[in-house]
A protein has these predicted regions:
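Beta-strand-enriched cores of mature, soluble protein domains
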Residues: 6-163
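C-terminal segment of classical bacterial N-terminal signal peptides
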Residues: 1-4
Length: 163
């Protein structure tokens, strides 16, 4: 299933990953007890035929602060918001907005877990609709490790019938 409207059901989950490049650019500024995080990353999209050959360019802003009792025991919490532009070429583009916060990821490590929504599409993706749960590396993990890490999206995507 490619997630077209007439084939899509609530149970259809389309999983894909953004393999984040090692040349991500982030800055960290102090603001009292918090740090303001901003920057961008790029990556190849893999794992879903509908999005095959796409590149993601994502921008984010957020803050990092000391965890308290309600923060699942994490010493430091990242709270991030961003926009990703997924492009096959200049004409076939998807825009998604997302937000996440430090939580326990699928593998038990600290990850930024949250939600995304597909807000705009052009070309092949005109009329796109849907949302996703996301699990992404923390900004500080990307800064420290300097390795490609995946951002995993579990999406429910629909497109209008193109007859």
């Amino acid at each position: 299933s490619f997630g077209y409207a007439n084939e899509n059901t609530k149970e259809d989950v389309q999983k894909f990953q953004i393999i984040i490049d090692t040349d991500s650019k982030f800055s960290i500024d102090r603001a009292g007890d918090s740090e303001i995080l901003s920057g961008s990353y790029n990556g190849d999209v893999t794992g879903l035929k509908l999005l095959e050959g796409m590149k993601a360019n994502c921008n984010l802003v957020g803050r990092s602060y000391q965890g308290r009792g309600f923060s699942c025991g994490f010493a430091e919490v990242e709270e991030l918001n961003g926009i990703c532009i997924f492009a096959k070429n200049k004409n076939d583009v998807i825009i998604a907005k997302w937000q996440c916060i430090t939580s326990v990821g699928d593998n038990g490590d600290a990850s930024c877990l949250g939600k995304a929504s597909f807000v705009e599409g052009h070309g092949l993706f005109a009329g796109i609709d849907g949302s996703a749960s996301i699990s992404s590396p923390l900004v500080k993990q990307l800064l420290e490790k300097k390795i490609s890490l995946p951002s995993v999206w579990k999406a429910n995507i629909s497109l209008p019938d193109k007859l």
